[in-house]
Amino acid sequence: MRDKITVIGSLNYDVILKIARLPEMGETFHADDVAFSAGGKGANQAVQAAKLGVPTYMVGCVGEDANGEILISEAKKYGVHTEYIRKVQEPTGMGVVNALQDGSVFAVIVKGANYAVTKEDIDHAEDLLKESAIVILQMEIPQEINMYAIDKAKEAGCKVLLNAAPAADIPEEYLKKVDILVVNEVEAAYYLHSEIDTIEKAKEGALQMSGELCNACIFTLGKEGSVVAQNGEVAFIPSKKVDAVESTGAGDSFIGATGYALIHGMDLVKACEFATGCSAIT
């Protein structure tokens, strides 16, 4: 029985600035606080799946530096298998996150070692893919590596979940190979060339995307919830109402939890309902 999740993607050392508002152009603005955290979409997603109890493996690169050591140590602490993380000469990837009091975030990432991932790294994990039920990908490593990983995952019989974030052009033939495409409203607007600013527009867009570009898709809508579309049907899943302290990583938690739920036999709607609860308490 295949019971593993393989996450291929990014590991970043995050600097999180707690601020009351974004500074104006040319303005120097004091942050209220600063925090340092292990991050990167790939690593965050892997940690959530591992915390829920799924055997989870991370494939990616970090630098031969202190930040890289921290990221590997943190992943191990939460149960992520790290033997497929390679150390390279490039500096470890970094994220700078501006976190506002209302829970919204504005982030910038430095590619660093994440763009050192090669086809050989994917080939090295070939046996692992054959034992994995799901491969999770994001868009924080080179696109050609993602496409190669999709091909290898499908050859190995894995279900592929692609978190198309940050949004970038993807050849349609590869989108159609993806089993589940996950985007937020900004990324959805990028691919549909149409603004997604209401739940109804999200439902319409998800139906369009699942019909034209991929097999199934999930639109995450922040505090509103999410929309799931597949096989010509669409469902809206409202968020769990909590007081948002800071939402960094909530979307990644959602994806890791979705992987867990799918491995445990839930259909996609039930999986997203489960993941919604997990991301609310991240």
Stretches with model-predicted labels:
Residues 61, 87, 97-134, 139:
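Conserved phosphate-binding/catalytic loop of the ribokinase/pfkB sugar-kinase fold
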Residues 46-55, 99-100, 261-265:
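Alpha-helix C-terminal capping segments
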Residues 2-5, 169, 199-282:
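Conserved phosphate-binding/catalytic region of the ribokinase-like
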Residues 1-61, 66-73, 77, 244-245:
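Glycine-rich phosphate/adenosyl-contacting loop at the front of the ribokinase-like
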